[in-house]
């Protein structure tokens, strides 16, 4: 009985058809697209340590026979010792395990608490589905949090601009009152700008020190 292989393929943005858009309920893909757009990278020490440990780990994958022969010939031509071919997975087992197993095919006995391989695969699929659901929930919370932060930033900017407009309006009223009281005062020279600029409080004295918005 051969062990079934599970292949999980994820469609990237490049492989996605041109007319197909990201589903509205797929928050994980939206978060990934936003991360790539903003060029965000995690800098958590735990993640960096895990990534470094994963890169340093060597995986004894079996190589084709042609590649093994090429490596042996390269070692012989170089004058050094020939490279040892990679061992088969059964050679990596302890002597007791390899002697007990022999050449018997893989049976459907108990596998780490499971009655059969199908039961283990069903449990694995269930765990992956639950992890996928948790990822979607976290991605939805992060996207909602980002929207709330942007909304608060816009509201704060509007409040600041509204306050500056109110200050400019009060200053304009004070200058109008002073200009009525002192007609010959040099303050009247500050109103030499155009009428629309004077209505919003932009004068020669504060044109370089204030910033205004349409909020």
Curated annotation (Swiss-Prot):
Taxonomic placement: Eukaryota, Metazoa, Chordata, Craniata, Vertebrata
Chain residue ranges for the region called Disordered: 1-26, 63-109
Any single Pfam family the record assigns to this protein: FAM167
UniProt entry keywords in alphabetical sequence: Coiled coil
Protein name: Protein FAM167A
Coiled-coil features, chain-numbered ranges: 124-157
Domain of life: Eukaryota
Gene name for this UniProt entry: Fam167a
Annotated family: Belongs to the FAM167 (SEC) family.
């Amino acid at each position: 009985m051969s062990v079934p292989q599970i292949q999980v393929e994820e469609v990237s943005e490049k492989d996605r058809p041109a007319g197909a858009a990201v589903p509205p309920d797929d928050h994980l893909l939206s978060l990934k697209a936003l991360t790539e757009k903003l060029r965000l990278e995690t800098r958590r020490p735990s993640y960096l340590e895990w990534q470094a440990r994963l890169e340093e780990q060597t995986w004894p994958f079996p190589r084709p026979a042609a590649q093994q022969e090429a490596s042996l010939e390269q070692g012989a031509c170089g004058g050094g010792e020939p490279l040892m071919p990679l061992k088969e997975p059964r050679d990596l087992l302890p002597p007791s395990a390899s002697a007990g197993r022999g050449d018997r095919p893989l049976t459907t006995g108990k596998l780490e608490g499971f009655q059969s391989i199908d039961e283990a695969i069903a449990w694995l699929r269930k765990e992956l589905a639950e992890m996928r659901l948790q990822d979607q929930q976290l991605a939805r919370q992060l996207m909602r949090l980002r929207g709330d932060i942007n909304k608060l930033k816009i509201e704060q900017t509007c409040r600041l601009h509204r306050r500056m407009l109110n200050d400019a309006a009060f200053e304009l009223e004070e200058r109008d009152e002073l200009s009525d009281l002192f007609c010959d005062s040099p303050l009247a020279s500050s109103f030499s700008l155009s009428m629309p600029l004077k209505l919003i409080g932009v004068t020669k004295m504060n044109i370089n020190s204030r910033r205004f918005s349409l909020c």
